[in-house]
Amino acid sequence: MAQLSALRLRGHPLAALFDEVAAPALHQIGEAWQRDRLSVAEEHVGSQAVIDAVARAQPLAEPPGEPVRPDRGVAVVAAVGSEQHDIAARMSACLLRAQGFEVLAPLAQTPAHDLAELVLRSRAALVALSSTMGNDHDESLRLAAAAARQTGGRVVVGGEGMRKARLPDEVRFLASLRDLDAEAQTAGRRRVRS
């Protein structure tokens, strides 16, 4: 994971690094744990190494002098339902901050009603939800989509747990963090109010 910062400093796009370095590392850790080649403690240590690398990548993601952009607005990022895996949500938050969004990230195990209330109160322009293994996200998706409709925002989802989900019509499945990066470039407020 140390290579993540070095590659970013060489100009590699952060979304590509997350897709090509961090995500495969997480898959290897998860598969090794499922096959009993890693203990729970070892799986947690490996996952924490990825979390630390994502945290270190944040300053490298943000363009100098371009903090939150008023044309972007707020993005809410969470791992839905009982989902305990929030590393993809952390990577998503990092990318969205780099795109100029003010990011509110409750991350893991965010209850559906609390998530919807946060979307409404923050007037979120973009809601990015992830699920690695969970399957109890129908209520979160339904409520987040309803809240986003009221704020004029978009809802995007990703992760293996979302592949089988019944998505409301206005919710878009994204297969990669590159897709999120591209989606974020067109999301947000359409004009700045003075």
Question: Which residue stretches match the model-derived regions?
Answer:
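Long amphipathic alpha-helical segments
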Residues: 1-67
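Short phosphate-binding/catalytic loops that engage adenosine nucleotides
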Residues: 12, 100-102, 152
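Conserved hydrophobic helix-helix packing surfaces used for dimerization/oligomerization
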Residues: 73-75
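A general structural motif
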Residues: 81, 85-87, 106-113
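Short helix-loop-beta junction
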Residues: 90-104
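Cofactor-cradling patches in redox/metallo enzymes
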Residues: 95-97, 110-167
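Peripheral docking tails and interdomain loops at the edges
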Residues: 159-194
